[in-house]
């Protein structure tokens, strides 16, 4: 069950600030069948014939169109595009035969046994699932075992226990980008993987000696005691969640320029929760009822990891850091967060006509500054059933109700470093993600610039003000239903990294005061169009639609805009917009280039010429700079929805479901990588990494302007709307055919 009601989310607290999903379990059977087994098998095929593979000859011909006529291409092309007799690059492409898996199998097998009576019952379940990926020999396997026990040792007292264990193993993809990011080491990127079958086979044979084991084990459970006596109810419970993540990776000398690499990573995340509740109901005359609920909880979250990396071992026989002569570096860290909350909920109900509730809650956390550990978060709701109170005799209306709720919910900060106060924090002498706080041994000087950013005193709780109101209805003896709701979600007091002068030694300053507002509407319709139980026919349909608008409402210190991490945050604009230059084509001649005060338009001091892009000069200074960038498009869809239908005939059923998203855009990174070859071929960075599927056509538009590859203005830079594409879609999510035994 998806929980979206702000009032219900407020009962769960900050962990549900982004929403929550209830997983409802059932008790053990009380008589009747007590053993169940179910299984499913799905096979899918990747159509390799639809992959339009290319080779070096195709790439050479593509690049030739970007140079002036008569240019000696071999002066500018990389080595792998020069020798047309090289069979590895100019031969028939065939890499897709090994890359795409055919067929792919997905299966699930589950079994359970249950039993017992009213005073004691149990449920024991086991299951396994496997999902083979579409490409790169990826797969996923999962094993789980669950045990549920309910007992009533004395009247009114129930004891409930849940134990769940899960193991997940995953075979990762072999992309070069992921490997280089893990190693933090770049070999030469001058030559990509060859596209031919023999070249692909050779590379895969090198990977046969590699290792990339990924295992995740999770164990969680709870013990709850609940007592009910007349109008009094009480309970206490303990819950735990323990998860381990282990990854062992090794890449041999054959794929890293005669150097090997190994890493061992182990981590655990541990959560422990103890909570209680005490409730009492008061019934008045004429159907009026009051309920009081007092709740409290304490929670501890602990995150711990050990990470060891080894470079340049003696040979490829030792695949771990425990031996083999590796140059080893070790990293470890632990973070502990504590949470506490208490709340009082008062509910009111008048028969089936009206219900209302208010909640007063305090949350405390250790990840904010000590002076601001506590946050008060109230909530309220109201439900009015028009059918029961005003329209009892209207037969064609089955149900009609108005509802509304509001809540303030705190948001946990992702780390306790924000509550530590001023710090000189850098990762320049560590590894990516391993932060070092300079405090002695001249670290505060040696680690400049401080890439994490300045944090001052007084970091407080971020929080969200959520509101929802709408109407629920059912018609014609519940055969038709229509629900509509309007919502507002205002995230306030958010941290944002703002730019500061470089002389401070920081690359930014974290400040609170950013506010982001999301508003929208959700509509759902459902109906049973045909219902003939005597003949066994039933046809039902359902549809849903949602619209969302996000907006930056404020920035710290009254700022109206700020540029951070390549994005422009501007008050009154959506936060998911792209910050790009507007591209209006190509200058066909030098005479087309605008001239102001006797000087031609420039880009970083370089004059534009024929064959260069027409970027829009927004501020009219005859210079193309970041000040000419505009906000365009949205990375998140504005409209989402779906449609489903199900046709039943006796024991058979046929169903289909569709999903759509519209109003979003995306930057075609693949096109950028293809067109900006003159820049990316020269640099050793992740943007220049060419995966095996670089040798594939069809994903890159061929109608872009052909700019001069020798231009000094970087014509195919990434931050322009040339690559911005609308990516709305309608997707067939599933088609199912079933038979009930």
Spans of features found by a protein language model:
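Conserved small-residue
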Residues: 36-87, 417-419, 425-430, 434, ...
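Extracellular/periplasmic, surface-exposed regions of secreted and cell-surface proteins
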Residues: 142, 148-167, 197-251, 261-578, ...
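Periplasmic N-terminal gating module of Gram-negative TonB-dependent outer-membrane receptors
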Residues: 1-3, 12-18, 29-38, 514-519
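N-terminal plug
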Residues: 1, 6-15, 45-49, 438-441
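Residues embedded in well-ordered regular secondary structure
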Residues: 19, 27-136, 174-176, 204-213, ...
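Conserved C-terminal beta-signal and adjacent last beta-strands/turns
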Residues: 112, 538-542, 634-662, 717-741
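Extracytoplasmic gating/loop element in the C-terminal half of outer-membrane beta-barrel translocons
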Residues: 85-86, 365, 608, 661-740
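Periplasmic plug
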Residues: 1-6, 38-44, 51-52, 123-125, ...
């Amino acid at each position: 069950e998806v929980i979206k009601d702000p009032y219900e989310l407020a009962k769960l607290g900050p962990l549900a600030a982004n929403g929550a999903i209830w997983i409802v379990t059932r008790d053990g059977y009380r008589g009747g069948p007590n053993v169940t087994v179910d299984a499913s098998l799905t096979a899918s095929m990747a159509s390799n014939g639809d992959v339009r593979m290319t080779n070096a000859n195709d790439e050479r011909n593509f690049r030739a169109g970007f140079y002036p006529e008569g240019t000696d291409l071999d002066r500018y092309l990389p080595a792998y595009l020069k020798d047309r007799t090289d069979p590895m690059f100019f031969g028939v492409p065939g890499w897709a035969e090994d890359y795409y898996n055919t067929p792919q199998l997905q299966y699930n097998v589950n079994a359970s046994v249950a039993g017992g009576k009213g005073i004691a019952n149990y449920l024991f379940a086991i299951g396994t699932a496997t999902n083979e990926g579409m490409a790169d020999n990826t797969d996923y396997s999962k094993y789980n075992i669950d045990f549920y026990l309910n007992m009533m040792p004395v009247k009114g007292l129930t004891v409930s226990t849940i134990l769940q264990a899960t193991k997940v193993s995953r075979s990762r993809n072999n992309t070069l980008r992921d490997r280089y990011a893990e190693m933090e080491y770049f070999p030469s990127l001058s030559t990509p993987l060859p596209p031919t079958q023999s070249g692909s086979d050779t590379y895969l044979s090198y990977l046969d000696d590699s290792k990339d084991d990924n295992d995740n084990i999770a164990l969680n459970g709870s013990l709850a005691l609940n007592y009910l006596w007349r109008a009094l109810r009480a309970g206490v419970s303990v819950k735990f969640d323990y998860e381990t993540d282990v990854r062992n990776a090794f890449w041999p000398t054959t794929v890293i320029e005669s150097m090997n690499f190994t890493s061992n990573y182990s981590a655990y995340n541990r959560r422990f929760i103890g909570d209680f509740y005490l409730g009492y109901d008061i019934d008045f005359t004429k159907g009026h009822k009051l309920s009081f609920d007092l709740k409290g909880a304490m929670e501890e979250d602990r995150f711990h990891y050990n990470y060891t990396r080894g470079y340049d071992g003696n040979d490829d026989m030792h695949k771990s850091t425990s031996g083999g002569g590796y140059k080893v570096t070790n990293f470890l860290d632990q973070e502990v967060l504590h949470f506490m909350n208490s709340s009082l909920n008062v509910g009111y109900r008048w028969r089936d006509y009206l219900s209302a509730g208010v909640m007063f809650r305090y949350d405390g956390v250790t990840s904010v500054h000590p002076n601001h550990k506590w946050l008060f978060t109230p909530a309220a709701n109201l439900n009015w059933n028009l059918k029961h109170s005003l329209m009892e005799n209207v037969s064609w209306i089955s149900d009609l109700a108005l509802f509304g709720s509001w809540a303030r919910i705190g948001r946990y900060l992702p780390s306790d470093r924000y509550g530590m106060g001023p710090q000189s924090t850098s990762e320049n002498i560590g590894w990516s993600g391993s932060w070092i706080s300079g405090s002695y041994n001249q670290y505060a000087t040696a680690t400049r610039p401080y890439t994490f950013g300045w944090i001052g005193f007084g970091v407080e709780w971020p929080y969200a003000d959520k509101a929802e109101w709408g109407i629920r209805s059912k018609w014609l003896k519940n055969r038709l239903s229509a629900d509509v709701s309007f919502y507002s979600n205002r995230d306030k007091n958010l941290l944002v990294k703002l730019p500061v002068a470089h002389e401070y030694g920081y690359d930014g300053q974290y400040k609170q005061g950013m506010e982001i507002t999301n508003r929208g509407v959700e509509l759902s319709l459902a109906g049973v169009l045909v219902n003939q139980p005597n003949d066994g026919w039933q046809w039902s349909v359902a549809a849903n639609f949602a619209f969302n608008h996000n907006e930056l409402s404020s920035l710290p210190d009254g700022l109206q805009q700020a540029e951070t991490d390549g994005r422009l945050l501007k008050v009154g604009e959506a936060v998911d917009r792209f910050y790009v230059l507007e591209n209006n084509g190509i200058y066909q001649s030098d005479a087309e280039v605008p001239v102001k005060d006797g000087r031609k338009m420039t880009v970083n001091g370089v004059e534009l010429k024929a064959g260069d892009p027409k970027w829009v000069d927004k501020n009219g200074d005859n210079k193309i700079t970041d000040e000419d960038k505009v906000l365009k498009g949205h990375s998140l869809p504005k409209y989402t929805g779906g449609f489903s239908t199900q046709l039943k005939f006796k024991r058979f059923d046929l169903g289909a479901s569709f999903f759509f998203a519209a109003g979003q855009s995306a930057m075609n990174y693949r096109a950028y990588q293809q067109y900006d070859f003159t820049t990316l071929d020269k640099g050793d960075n992740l943007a220049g990494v060419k995966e095996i599927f670089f040798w594939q056509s069809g994903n890159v538009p061929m109608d872009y302007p052909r700019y001069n590859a020798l231009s000094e203005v970087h014509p195919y830079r990434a931050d322009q709307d040339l690559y911005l594409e609308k990516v709305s879609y309608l997707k067939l999510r599933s088609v199912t055919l079933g038979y009930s035994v």
